[in-house]
């Protein structure tokens, strides 16, 4: 029977499936960070259990860390306790930890792929909703809760029901300057923020195949923002070339054997999906969210929508509430909306290609008066690479702040946050009320669009910036 990529990955990992019971899946990689793991390790300790597969478990610090100093005390008591607990737990249970002083430390979903921990065909879990990022490699990757973190630590397995399948095909080629972030925001604009609920999404089509691995990671990272369980892109030569030579990737003949298997990880001809969505790449322009969920998104050259234009009463009420929170009036051009802060970073857009795209806009320009702009590389290796290329100097000369790796202003769990009423052009993944700080107003954009907002002081079409 013809199978989708998701069905192949799921079926290959079923350890046991009794009739009328939820299947038990084997987990190939478990990524751990300081926020969702302390109680899980306490649970192991209370029952005298070891970590079943410490060699398949990798930990880092990201959510709570300061991006201005490597001092563990910098972000307050709760952050310090969580980081100290992670150090203690990893030492006691034999788990590899990339702590604040480790050169590989960084956002968990940046660290995994760049170290070759993430490989095609794997099941990957983490106590973090944006674990879907790793699906860019043709891996089944999804976020789990803290009780499930404990279960995986103890057994290297997890009970998981089968999801529905969705194909999202982006046909044709994207226009110059249109990024994976624009593509995925356009997709969510079409599906809505709950359009993928109960599904695992496979992204395909020419515009997706044209993306680099970093672009595919941005795409899959935000699958969760349309309500999907996970996002997938079938592995191809782009994938294999990215993986080859990385620290934890197979070497020599093992790599060749792995590639031979990875090439089978494609949706079969004739396989059926529960839901199919199609977009035309050439119709996608630079995207900016205007509301308080990622589906409330428009082209940069559009006007803020009028809630009265929504036929659905729920959407209309949601739009009214969003505009009130965001302090926006219907009908005004988006490019007239001024911003206070810019955040370039997060597990969505903090990799080297993202920083290059932002630096290209920042070069030779200055951050607009009254705007604070942060650039936060996703990991130690990304920061080192950017500095080797001189990107840090471009940003600093333009008036951006060049920070240490971490989750930073994506979420208000550290010192980087918005004050009430502040408006931010952000390359992160969520624009919910209070996500970047109580009363903060978040607009999601690509790295180049964020840099353009920083230097102009308002939203601007990067295609018009010469």
From Swiss-Prot:
Molecular function (Gene Ontology), one example: metal ion binding
Catalyzed chemical reaction(s): (2R,3S)-3-isopropylmalate = (2S)-2-isopropylmalate
Binding site for [4Fe-4S] cluster: 347, 407, 410
Cofactor: [4Fe-4S] cluster
Pfam families for this protein: Aconitase
Pathway(s) per entry: Amino-acid biosynthesis; L-leucine biosynthesis; L-leucine from 3-methyl-2-oxobutanoate: step 2/4
Subunit structure: Heterodimer of LeuC and LeuD.
Annotated function: Catalyzes the isomerization between 2-isopropylmalate and 3-isopropylmalate, via the formation of 2-isopropylmaleate.
Protein name: 3-isopropylmalate dehydratase large subunit
Organism: Shigella flexneri serotype 5b (strain 8401)
Classification of source organism: Bacteria, Pseudomonadati, Pseudomonadota, Gammaproteobacteria, Enterobacterales
